[in-house]
Amino acid sequence: MLEHVKTQIRRFYDWGFRLIKHDFSSIDLCGLWGKDMKFFATGLPFADQTVTTAEVVLHFYEAIREAAQDAVVIGCNTFPHLLAGLAELNRTGDDTSGYDWNRTRRMGVNTLAFRMPQNRTFYMSDADCVGIRPAGDVPWALNKEWLRLLARSGAPLFVSCDPKAATPEVRATLTEAFRINAVQTDEAEPLDWLDNTCPADWKINGQTEHFHWYDELGYNAALDPEK
């Protein structure tokens, strides 16, 4: 199996890809999402019962790293402490959304805050992207706050933008955000993390800043299709 994995990764490399992302390996290997795992991930053993689950996972990550050569590797749905040193970046949270702001707030802001200690320690910690769609989905004012924090977090910045939503203001704001993030000299630390699951107060380069994760009414249920 490891040779098969290497063959596939080498193929991507030979095609010219220099940014390779692997995803869903933890659920493929263990049969469960991390949040659903108890003491045992699965009742089924691996074919080689002389190695532990951790060793199986580590060998898998090492195979990808070897085959990717000098390409940048992004992990996703991984075991962070085992991936450390074997990928330049790692998606550390679930998907954010261009449709549902509450999902971005829960999966993006929360992830950035509580997985920040891994950034530049295990790898660059990717809290997922800013999803920008035309008016009627997530308000630009809220997405702009998320973009402002990500750009200055010292963590990677990714954006998924519908061209129809790329107004002159959006383009100018994105250009400035990428200019800031490309330097990667900023340091950000959540301050109210003990009593806020989506920290709004951050220390950025030694200065305290406040971010607004709610609309003017506090919380707008219309932005959360799941509720």
Predicted segments, located by residue:
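Short, well-ordered loop/turn elements at secondary-structure boundaries
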Residues: 14-16, 68, 146, 152-153, ...
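Short conserved micro-motifs at the rims of enzyme active sites and ligand-binding pockets
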Residues: 84-86, 134-136, 161-164, 222-224
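Short, solvent-exposed loop/turn segments at secondary-structure junctions
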Residues: 26-27, 79-81, 157, 164, ...
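Catalytic cores of secreted or luminal carbohydrate-active enzymes
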Residues: 148-183
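Polar/charged alpha-helical tracts
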Residues: 3, 7, 66, 149, ...
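Carbohydrate-binding surface patches
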Residues: 150-153, 157-158, 191-227
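Aromatic- and carboxylate-enriched substrate-binding clefts and catalytic-loop regions
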Residues: 1-137, 142, 170
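N-terminal low-complexity/IDR leader segments of large eukaryotic scaffold/assembly proteins
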Residues: 183-190
